[in-house]
């Protein structure tokens, strides 16, 4: 059986994602569609609008055959690590293609990535007045004639780099689908039936009805920031500089900025971010670092987790079950479908902890991991 892979967040699953899934199946004619989806926390270091089980159910209902969780240690990362981890897992699941959306579906991203520039020591760019991303895009344009700036193009480029870096060009074909109707960062609902996840989340936060934009029913917005801030404020107030410095991705003296910020007694999460923010750090990076601190994820713990990946099964159809049976013994990484306390404390330690905190700030009662079984359809 041949499988195609989709790398997703589904935050929430909406009509654009449905189009992507159906188009991927149409283009590849694959026997099985595998969705690799971020769990309860998404790449920007924020909690997903609804938990991984409801989003996995939406994917299965829409026609996915297998849904696996992209573990926290890959999901809540800068784009390059996110892409490298996702491609690594899908490669082990033996997909023959990865289908992603892009603003320029006519671009050969593998060829583009093969011309990746090295801007280190490049005196043509004034790094004091431009971000690394701007310098990089300009260097790439200089070499290829293409200016990389759109969100989905950047992701496609990251997947292409991951395929090249892992020597998978003979094994996995990267194909892109043109994004339709809504831009990735669009803030407002449009008159059609496809809106960005950003716009849908914003509309939900304002009490608007979004039923025409998503097949997911009963979506609700939870104002999580106050709970998140209280937990984080306690952690930052009681941890010393050495403890904060030991956290993954806390470097370049960031611990001093964070400590100084919390000592100014910010009133909410937004004010805390504003006190830490500088040109050196994007808001996305700060979100991620603060979540790493909240979850007390040390450098060695994160590195160890990334060295020992696994496939966490969230849902499957009969065809998906057949695929797993056919491929039994051929995956290098273990497949986890049932979680007991021992597994939660060892293999799934980071994701288990992330699920517990997610439940607290989102006011969820259902367990996220222990004794949860994959969705079957």
Swiss-Prot record:
SS bond partners: none
EC number annotated for this UniProt entry: 6.3.4.-
Keywords: ATP-binding, Cytoplasm, Ligase, Nucleotide-binding, RNA-binding, tRNA processing, tRNA-binding
Amino-acid positions noted as binding ATP in the UniProt annotation, renumbered to this chain: 7-20, 101, 152, 179
GO molecular function, one term: ligase activity, forming carbon-nitrogen bonds
Domain of life of the source: Bacteria
GO biological process: tRNA modification
Family matches, as InterPro entries: Rossmann-like_a/b/a_fold, tRNA(Met)_cyd_acetate_ligase
Intracellular or extracellular location(s): Cytoplasm
An example Gene Ontology CC term for this record: cytoplasm
Primary site of residence: cytoplasm
EC class of the enzyme, as a word: ligase
Keyword tRNA processing: yes
Pfam families named in the record: HIGH_NTase1
Gene3D superfamilies: HUPs
Catalyzed chemical reaction(s): cytidine(34) in elongator tRNA(Met) + acetate + ATP = N(4)-acetylcytidine(34) in elongator tRNA(Met) + AMP + diphosphate
Role this protein plays: Catalyzes the formation of N(4)-acetylcytidine (ac(4)C) at the wobble position of elongator tRNA(Met), using acetate and ATP as substrates. First activates an acetate ion to form acetyladenylate (Ac-AMP) and then transfers the acetyl group to tRNA to form ac(4)C34.
Family classification: Belongs to the TmcAL family.
Protein name per its UniProtKB record: tRNA(Met) cytidine acetate ligase
Organism in which the protein naturally occurs: Oenococcus oeni (strain ATCC BAA-331 / PSU-1)
């Amino acid at each position: 059986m041949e499988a195609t892979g989709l790398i997703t967040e589904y935050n929430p699953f909406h009509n654009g994602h449905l189009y992507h899934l159906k188009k991927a199946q149409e283009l590849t004619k694959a026997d099985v569609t595998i969705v690799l989806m971020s769990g309860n926390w998404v790449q920007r270091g924020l909690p997903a609008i609804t938990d991984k089980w409801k989003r996995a159910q939406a994917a299965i209902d829409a026609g996915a055959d297998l849904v696996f969780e992209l573990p926290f240690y890959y999901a809540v990362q800068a784009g390059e690590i996110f892409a490298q981890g996702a491609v690594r897992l899908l490669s082990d699941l033996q997909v023959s293609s990865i289908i992603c959306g892009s603003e320029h579906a006519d671009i050969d991203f593998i060829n583009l990535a093969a011309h990746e520039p090295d801007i280190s020591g490049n005196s043509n760019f004034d790094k004091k007045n431009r971000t690394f991303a701007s310098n990089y895009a300009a260097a790439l344009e200089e070499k290829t004639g293409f200016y990389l700036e759109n969100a989905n193009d950047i992701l496609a480029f990251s997947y292409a780099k991951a395929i090249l870096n892992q020597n998978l060009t003979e094994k996995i074909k990267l194909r892109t689908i043109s994004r339709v109707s809504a831009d990735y960062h669009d803030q407002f609902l449009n008159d059609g039936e496809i809106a960005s996840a950003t716009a849908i989340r914003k509309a939900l936060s304002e009490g608007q009805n979004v039923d025409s934009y998503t097949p997911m029913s009963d979506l609700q917005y939870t104002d999580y920031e106050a709970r998140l801030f209280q937990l984080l404020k306690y952690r930052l107030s009681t941890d010393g500089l050495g403890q904060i410095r030991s956290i993954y991705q806390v470097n370049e003296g960031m611990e001093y900025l964070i400590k100084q910020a919390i000592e100014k007694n910010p009133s909410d999460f937004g004010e805390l971010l504003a006190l830490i923010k500088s040109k050196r750090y994007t808001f996305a990076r700060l979100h991620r670092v603060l979540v790493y601190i909240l979850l007390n994820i040390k450098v060695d713990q994160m590195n160890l987790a990334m060295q020992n990946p696994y496939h966490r099964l969230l849902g499957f159809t009969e065809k998906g079950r057949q695929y797993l049976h056919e491929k039994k013994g051929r995956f290098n990484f273990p497949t986890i479908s049932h979680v007991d306390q021992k597994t939660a404390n060892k293999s799934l330690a980071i994701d288990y902890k992330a699920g517990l905190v997610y439940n607290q700030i989102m006011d969820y009662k259902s367990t996220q991991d222990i004794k949860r079984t994959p969705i079957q359809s």
